[in-house]
Amino acid sequence: MDFIKLKKNLEKNGFKVSVFENACSAAEYLDREIDGMTVGMGGSVTMKQMDLYRKLSAHNDVFSNADTPGKTREEISREAQTADIYLSSLNGISENGELINIDGTGNRVSAIQYGHKKVYLIAGSNKVAKDYEAALYRARNIAGPLNAKRLGKKTPCAVKGDKCYDCNSPERICRGLSVLWKKPGGCEYEVVLIDEELGY
């Protein structure tokens, strides 16, 4: 993976970029950087593999649908939307530096766009694709079906596990699309690239 070229393109698009050899070193970096803050986390296999909730919740107030006890999903999502820091993995990233996420309820794609002091976007090497079309294809036809299956959805993509069927199922999880061509105004963004396969 040519992270040098990708880093250069992301920086040209206005993003701060950090590159790590493995998930452990990336998690240690984030654990050092984020301290004494309110932190929102989108649902993410990548971040679960990095054990970020456990690490960060030791010295931050963390809101994560997958991990925060004692609150409803809706309460957690609202608190995550207004947290100082927001963390999300990416479903796809092009070599040109375009960042793609697909969402079912919209909590993650909306939180990425606005409302925080800083947003960290995390991607393993498997999320990188040649161009925008390939990154979008990856998000819809690889990440989407695998996530639907993980969540126990009864959608065609989860059952067959091979591609997006653009279905009308009430359990469909790909309902909203976020594409960041350039760094949005209003807050700081950092893309965390990890030279390991992580998540879907």
Give the positions of each predicted feature.
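Conserved phosphate- and dinucleotide-binding cores of soluble alpha/beta proteins
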Residues: 81-200
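N-terminal active-site beta-alpha-beta segment that forms phosphate/nucleotide-binding
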Residues: 2-87
